[in-house]
Design a protein with these regions (language model features):
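Sec-dependent signal peptide recognition
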Residues: 1-3
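Functional surface patches built around histidine and acidic residues
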Residues: 15-281, 302, 306, 322-325
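C-terminal motif of bacterial Sec signal peptides marking the signal peptidase cleavage site
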Residues: 8-11
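Solvent-exposed serine/threonine-rich low-complexity stretches and specific carbohydrate-binding patches
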Residues: 287-299
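Extended, polar beta-sheet/loop recognition surfaces of beta-rich domains
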Residues: 263, 268-270, 317, 328-345
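Surface-exposed, short loops/turns at beta-strand junctions within beta-sandwich domains
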Residues: 312-319
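Short proline/glycine- and polar residue-rich coil/turn motifs
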Residues: 297-303, 316, 331-333
Length: 345
């Protein structure tokens, strides 16, 4: 029996302004395998909110229009996956060279990017109409593909979507977007596509998460020192892929995976001048930790009050860790925090 599991995390959007510009034979179009607020999506919502709330970032409220936005795009990616017999995930719904049924001709097309999909002008025949007026928005996508020659294999959707969410939390930029404290509402969609190629049966799972702050709510700046993980949280233990790569072109995460990152958000009016951290397991240091700040971030996504500590090596599964970090702000003020967390089996 041959089995293969692959995961992919696509580039995540951070906060976005509501004023920004947004600018052969095919297989049958797939029918979405789950509906909004299905058991699987509710499990993902529960896990997301438990982690946000426990670490002080606040829980999110489900929004039906965001659910529809997420469902449209998840269905688009599922359609492209099935038509081309290869896993596909992207933040954009544009024509892709070498792929069939991409762009505006796809029956689930709803907009070139997330900003357009929140208020779609052009819809494919199977896409649904939706509208969401936002101040800030973000998008996280996770893809998991399982290949096997076992025709009786079935996917445990709930376990799969939870593992996909843990993978997102283990990715520095995706983690940052998932816990963004100004987001108050969320929409999710999970799709499963089954297809066969080269005598292998593939099960492609797609998770689309759209988070936002509606225009009707006041934007409240963060005034706390927050971090994820935090006391009592269970996380992933390694990361083998993220786009964009937090190391730029200097490291291939597939061959040099990293451990669960530590994301720290200082109050909005603070600028982090120095940041140090130690991570130990039963008193023994785990080794090198990379420090990502607004100055060292190769993708220029972090703000002046953010830092991400990244273990150089994967952590151990089902293991407890102790974290201690210190920040020095540009006004000379120092702050520290300590907490423990555990990795999942």
């Amino acid at each position: 029996m041959l089995t293969l599991l692959a995961t992919l995390l696509t580039a995540c959007g951070g906060g976005g302004s509501g004023n920004s510009d947004s600018s052969s034979t095919t297989s049958p179009t797939p029918i979405p395998t789950s509906t909004t607020n299905s058991t699987v999506e509710l499990a993902a919502m529960k896990l997301l909110n438990e982690n946000r709330s426990q670490c002080g970032f606040g829980s999110l409220t489900a929004n039906q229009n965001l659910n529809l936005t997420a469902m449209n795009h998840a269905s688009y990616m599922a359609s492209v996956t099935e038509t081309n017999k290869q896993p596909f995930a992207s933040h954009e719904e544009r024509v892709e060279t070498g792929l069939l049924d991409t762009g505006i001709t796809n029956p689930y097309y709803s907009g070139i990017d997330l900003a357009a999909r929140l208020n779609p002008f052009t819809l494919g025949k199977n896409a649904v109409s939706t509208y969401y007026d936002y101040q800030a928005q973000g998008e996280n996508i996770s893809l998991s593909n399982f290949s096997t020659n076992n025709s009786s294999y079935t996917v445990n959707d709930t376990a799969t979507v939870e593992a996909m969410l843990y993978n997102l939390f283990a990715a520095p930029y995706h983690l940052r977007s998932l816990v963004y404290p100004q987001f108050t509402e969320v929409g999710l969609s999970y799709q499963l596509v089954k297809w066969t190629a080269n005598n292998e049966i593939n099960h492609t799972s797609l998770l689309e998460i759209v988070s936002a702050l509606p225009s009707s709510q006041k934007y409240i700046e963060n005034t706390k020192l927050l971090n994820f993980p935090c006391d009592g949280v269970t996380t992933g233990y390694e990361l083998t892929d993220e786009t964009p790569n937090p190391f730029g072109t200097t490291r291939d995460l597939k061959y040099q995976p990293i451990g669960q990152p530590i994301y720290v958000l200082a109050p909005f009016d603070k600028t982090i001048a120095e940041a140090t951290a130690t991570i130990t397991q039963n008193g023994t240091s785990i080794g090198m930790i990379h420090t990502l700040t607004s100055l060292s971030d190769p993708n220029k996504l972090l703000s002046k009050n953010e830092v991400i500590f990244i273990p150089d090596l994967p952590l151990k599964p089902n293991t407890g860790y102790q974290v201690s970090y210190q920040l020095v702000y540009n006004d000379g003020q120092k702050t520290t925090n300590q907490f423990t967390f555990k990795t999942r089996p």
